[in-house]
């Protein structure tokens, strides 16, 4: 669902840091 996708996007953003 949307929440899962958002969490994945956030995790990717953190990894990019």
Curated annotation (Swiss-Prot):
BP-aspect Gene Ontology terms: chemical synaptic transmission; neuropeptide signaling pathway
UniProt keyword Secreted present: yes
Gene Ontology CC entries for this record: extracellular region; synapse
Primary location group: secreted
UniProt keyword annotation of Secreted present: yes
Cellular localization per UniProt: Secreted
UniProt superkingdom: Eukaryota
Entry keywords, A to Z: Neuropeptide, Neurotransmitter, Opioid peptide, Secreted
GO molecular function annotation: opioid peptide activity
Record-stated family: Belongs to the opioid neuropeptide precursor family.
Record's function text: Ligand of the opioid receptor-like receptor OPRL1. It may act as a transmitter in the brain by modulating nociceptive and locomotor behavior. May be involved in neuronal differentiation and development. When administered intracerebroventricularly into mice, this peptide induces hyperalgesia and decreases locomotor activity.
Protein name: Nociceptin
